[in-house]
Amino acid sequence: MLETRKPAGELFRLGRKPDPWQPPDWSRANPDGTFGNRFDDPQGRYRVLYASSQRISCFVETLARFRPDLTLLAELAQIDGEDDFFPMGKVPRDWCDRRLLGVASADVEHADIYASGWIALLRTKLADECLRLGIADLDAGFLQVAPRRITQLASRQAYERSCPGIYYRSRYGHDFDNWAIFEPFPIIPVSSTAIASGDADLTEALKILRVELSGT
């Protein structure tokens, strides 16, 4: 039997106002039918909502794109002298104003596609596509950093087996448990709240990522 995981508690999601659990409109889809995200449907038939078990994970996942460029960090590391300067990425000041933090329950089993049974299945089902892309092998380590095409095809494999979504650990830290929830979204929204600039989890996420709100 293929491995599954169920959320141990409520799920959190950062989304745009007025409803953080509203999926993106199909009009915003890319020409390939996806929205460019990790577990989107490669056939463009179902949409996916991304949520986290940890409130702070929502901030880390969403704000990671504002981190300082890795090339810049490498160049700074080569400069002689006191290591007392670290360039901070800048988050637009209105970032908080345009979003809400939603809370929902999702008491259903999700595909744990990084578990051994799923890896064995995906290695077989996605073999042709892996070879076409020049990928020599597929294992859990590779799937963690695999091209979008591969993770999206893995999503389709889970969907075709009637899984309501996927459990996965964050690329930014395996202490963050994330969930890709397939349409028709088996969730029960509980609440949604505005994000204060002094929010404790937001502040900690900014610290982890070495970014800051513009104007602070």
Regions inferred by a protein language model and the residue ranges of each:
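Extended catalytic/binding region for NAD+/ADP-ribose chemistry, centered on the ART fold
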Residues: G36-L73
